[in-house]
Curated annotation (Swiss-Prot):
Catalysed reactions listed for this entry: Hydrolysis of proteins to small peptides in the presence of ATP and magnesium. alpha-casein is the usual test substrate. In the absence of ATP, only oligopeptides shorter than five residues are hydrolyzed (such as succinyl-Leu-Tyr-|-NHMec, and Leu-Tyr-Leu-|-Tyr-Trp, in which cleavage of the -Tyr-|-Leu- and -Tyr-|-Trp bonds also occurs)
Alphabetized PANTHER family for the sequence: ATP-DEPENDENT CLP PROTEASE PROTEOLYTIC SUBUNIT
The name this protein goes by in its record: ATP-dependent Clp protease proteolytic subunit 2
Function text: Cleaves peptides in various proteins in a process that requires ATP hydrolysis. Has a chymotrypsin-like activity. Plays a major role in the degradation of misfolded proteins.
Keywords associated with the record: Cytoplasm, Hydrolase, Protease, Serine protease
Species classification: Bacteria, Bacillati, Cyanobacteriota, Cyanophyceae, Synechococcales
Amino acid sequence: MPISAPGPLPTVVEQSGRGDRAFDIYSRLLRERIIFLGTGVDDAVADALVAQMLFLEAEDPEKDIQIYVNSPGGSVTAGLAIYDTMQQVAPDVVTICYGLAASMGAFLLSGGTKGKRLALPNARIMIHQPLGGAQGQAVDIEIQAKEILFLKETLNGLLAEHTGQPLDKISEDTDRDYFLSPAEAVEYGLIDRVVDSSGDEGIVTDG
């Protein structure tokens, strides 16, 4: 199941010697090794993205996988499942931000293959620390607080690794919502380049 915003899906009709075949647009693009993350991140979204990446790896372990990201973020554990798979699969993973990549969306954007992390000119990127809350007895709140702190340290460490920024700067910048333009995201190290108007900077479909 391609991950995209809800609503009716455009259909692509292909003609062949066996007759016409209809595909929804996202399934057709999956054949071109293009995956969309166009919604919040939860367990169902993670399962679908992981399955698509593993399928494309099995199809051809040498051709790039492209992931288009327009996501407000979501579950940290679900996002880390996607991230770990991105690092595990044999093909390079090209990440392309269109619209907004925020929170876990920005983290996944930065986790693409170095040199192949892109953004469209008017995209926005936002990083911040994990959000969380706890209710119940004091011991339960303490357990949740420790887990949130652990996840924060894990994400900050990985962001420092992918951006080249010092860990203390990552910790300071993610203490509150931190918005960046594509050019600022390049300077920060979250992405590698901005796609220009001609498309020459990187959105390429394998033929």
